[in-house]
Amino acid sequence: MTQPSGLKNLLRAAAGALPVVPRTDQLPNRTVTVEELPIDPANVAAYAAVTGLRYGNQVPLTYPFALTFPSVMSLVTGFDFPFAAMGAIHTENHITQYRPIAVTDAVGVRVRAENLREHRRGLLVDLVTNVSVGNDVAWHQVTTFLHQQRTSLSGEPKPPPQKKPKLPPPAAVLRITPAKIRRYAAVGGDHNPIHTNPIAAKLFGFPTVIAHGMFTAAAVLANIEARFPDAVRYSVRFAKPVLLPATAGLYVAEGDGGWDLTLRNMAKGYPHLTATVRGL
């Protein structure tokens, strides 16, 4: 099969948000499969330009997330999924690159859902994506989404609020504008209106539009990606959303065979994401 269009996924997500759509409490027992998916070098170049990553013979570490996003969303927007895609929150993302993927490669894609579980704030599910070149898996990803609802764990106490840390000057400052996020949405194929439409963002509880989590996950790598080994693991945990426009400070600590990254609100010090990069 070929990947569905972003518009088709968006329409299915909107239809799936209607309360008349029945939902099961089980994950779909199917795998979305795409054979011989070509990579568009022009799209890779546009992705690199908007995120600040390098454009060369190999795709950036996070690019396959954008490449395979239509396949992931075709699974999540199915009416056999246990909850609606609209309003789901991206909480974590774990990428393992076993070997670089060339911009000239055609790849195979496999996406499945697993590990549906309860959380204090709702239901968590993992979307597992494998990207293959030939017969070998080159890139593996586990994307975790949260659907907010009451569960048996809803009465658990919230973690105590963290005190504002005393921070040194950041290693870099990211200035993120609504225009940049609209460009990322066009390039990355994630047209969720909470990122591009202030009215839609308010309907989902945000005071204004927010940056895509995977935009920030890509942008924080710009200063260190030239030093990555070919085989690498990148784990990201998302915290408070980036309200646009935003100025965020990037803090980088090197050691233990890799890097620890934190993107923080410059005024209040709270984290937008924490991440680790480690060689395999």
Swiss-Prot record:
One of its GO terms (biological process) is fatty acid metabolic process. It catalyses: a (3R)-3-hydroxyacyl-CoA = a (2E)-enoyl-CoA + H2O; (2E)-octenoyl-CoA + H2O = (3R)-hydroxyoctanoyl-CoA; (3R)-3-hydroxydodecanoyl-CoA = (2E)-dodecenoyl-CoA + H2O; (3R)-hydroxyhexadecanoyl-CoA = (2E)-hexadecenoyl-CoA + H2O. It comes from the Bacteria. Residues 149-170 are annotated as: Disordered. Keywords: Fatty acid metabolism, Lipid metabolism, Lyase. Disruption phenotype: Deletion of the gene does not affect the biosynthesis of all three types of mycolic acid. Residues 162-256 form the MaoC-like domain. It is an enzyme of class 4 (lyase). InterPro entries: Fatty_acid_synthase, HotDog_dom_sf, MaoC-like_dom. One of its GO terms (molecular function) is 3-hydroxyacyl-CoA dehydratase activity. Shows trans-enoyl-CoA hydratase/3-hydroxyacyl-CoA dehydratase activity. Displays a broad chain length specificity, with a predilection for the C8 to C12 substrates. This is 3-hydroxyacyl-thioester dehydratase X. It comes from Mycobacterium tuberculosis (strain ATCC 25618 / H37Rv). The lineage of its organism: Bacteria, Bacillati, Actinomycetota, Actinomycetes, Mycobacteriales. The gene is htdX.
